[in-house]
Regions:
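Sequence/structural signature of beta-propeller domains
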Residues: 1-343
């Protein structure tokens, strides 16, 4: 039987945006590689040697960000048609973007392996980027075309619904959890829903090494989530990160018509999935308690006891930088028992 979880807002939690830092490249713009002076998009975050790796949905650059200075080093990803690395409606090439939306970094055989996933919302967006050799001046980048993996995920209708749209990934031991947004349309009796599934990490790595021969891992442990509404707009997952025994997630209330087009954003929430499955969230606010209306696309769990996390806001504006936010978490985020008592 398909498992469902229902999330609820939790008044005992708070997520306060303390700092908003626009992201710029150390070296400025580079017309030769079609790179603007700023990190124009932001989809997901992971810690790598040298900083925080940030993937972008509509620009073929990996940005390695120093969170203290908000300056970034650019790592080139393969160019698209015509040698371009920026994609948007203004250029008329939005359909050609890789749409990288989720990423993880892990120690594999003594080195950091970074893996970023296309959303799978169209056939063009069925690629996986693998980056290794971080000790080199230019880490080694491989673009793996992975239609077999995405076809396998789409076959799991409870997970993918009518329109697969991967938005987050989280690694725990040998299982990779994938998060889908849930903003597509109905597929028969299957309504769109935010959902998760797991795949075997080692099987995935074997597939990425030889996708023409090795079968993709099968999705398992599908969970569908009803995250609720924010200002009347349905919430959908945008990213997730492990923090001790719990899962932190971000979700946005975006009135998009489908898994491809953008829509008006009503705001974002930070949520938690406890070890017992209890799922709750709180809207993001600024230090004055006012609603924070940015579209949070990526999250990185706190690295110490300070309880501050990083999140990236994508402005969906080709002429503006994405923004790295520092967020303070207040309340019983890691204590489900006290949280339930407070509710």
């Amino acid at each position: 039987m398909l498992a469902h979880r229902t999330a609820a807002p939790d008044p005992s939690l708070a997520a306060v945006v303390l700092r908003q830092a626009p992201l710029y490249y150390d070296d400025g713009a580079d017309p030769a590689t079609d790179r603007p002076a700023y990190v124009r998009a932001g989809s997901s975050l992971a810690r790598v040697p040298g900083g925080i790796a940030l993937v972008q949905d509509d620009a073929n650059f990996l940005a390695v960000v120093d969170p203290g200075t908000a300056r970034a080093r650019a790592i080139l990803l393969p160019a698209g048609n015509g040698g371009v690395r920026q994609f948007d409606k203004g250029r008329g090439n939005k359909a050609d973007k890789l749409d990288l939306e989720a990423c993880v970094a892990a120690d594999v055989d003594g080195e950091t392996l970074f893996v970023a996933f296309g959303s799978g919302s169209t056939s063009r967006r069925e690629a996986v980027v693998v980056v290794r050799d971080w000790d080199l001046a230019e880490p080694r980048v491989e673009l793996v075309h992975a239609p077999g993996l995405y076809a396998r995920l789409r076959e799991e209708i409870a997970f993918a619904g009518d329109a697969l749209n991967l938005e987050g990934a989280m690694l725990c031991d040998d299982r990779l959890t994938l998060f889908t947004r849930g903003n597509g349309s109905a597929r028969g009796e299957s309504l769109p829903a935010a959902a998760t599934c797991t795949v075997d990490w080692r099987e995935l790595l074997a597939f990425l090494r030889d996708p023409g021969v090795t079968p993709p891992p099968a999705p398992a442990n599908v969970l569908r989530y009803e995250l609720g509404l924010l200002n009347g707009v349905r919430l959908g997952f945008t990213d997730a990160a492990r923090w001790g025994d719990i899962v932190l997630f971000t979700a946005a209330a975006e009135a998009s018509p489908d898994a491809v087009e953008d829509g008006a954003v009503e705001g974002s929430v930070i949520g938690v999935i406890g070890a017992d499955g209890d799922t709750r969230w709180t809207p993001l606010v600024d230090e004055g308690g006012r609603a924070f209306t940015g579209k949070v696309e990526g999250v990185l769990a706190p690295h110490d006891d300070a309880g501050h996390l990083f999140a990236v806001v994508d402005t969906d504006d080709a002429d503006a930088p994405s923004v790295l936010c520092t967020i303070r978490l207040d309340g019983p985020w890691q204590d489900q028992r006290n949280a339930r008592a407070a509710r």
